[in-house]
Each structure stands twice: as C-alpha cells, then as structure tokens.
Amino acid sequence: MTKLPSSDKVISVLLDYGFVFKSQKGSHQKYKNKEKTVIVPAPRKQIPIGTLKSISKQSGIAYSEFINL
C-alpha cells in the first residue's frame, strides 16, 4: 500500500490548484477557491485515507493527485 501524504503535502496540492488559506480553528485549516471550501486537519504526519477521500471530494481534485506525491 502506498504511503499516505502528510497535511503539508495535501495543502501544497490545494495551493497548486488555486485554493488559498482562509482561517484556522484549533487543528483544522480552511482553504477556499472561487467555488469550494475544503477543511484540512493540520498539522498531521499522515492524513487518514477516509479524510483524504473527503478532501478530494470537497475540492474536486482527483484522489490520485494526493496519493502520487
């Protein structure tokens, strides 16, 4: 099984796709583009697979983009 990415790598993919940091509450950061808002738990060494799939769905970015880092 492939190694799951850290929150830093997930955030870098979001930034590459035009998302910008909006706010943080506790350990959750909010990133937003023109249409969508994505919540990322940060900092984490590994993002759990279910959370990663949820981030993929919220952002509209293919799951494979996050795995192939």
Language-model-detected regions and their locations in the chain:
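Basic nucleic-acid-binding interfaces
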Residues: 1-25, 30-69
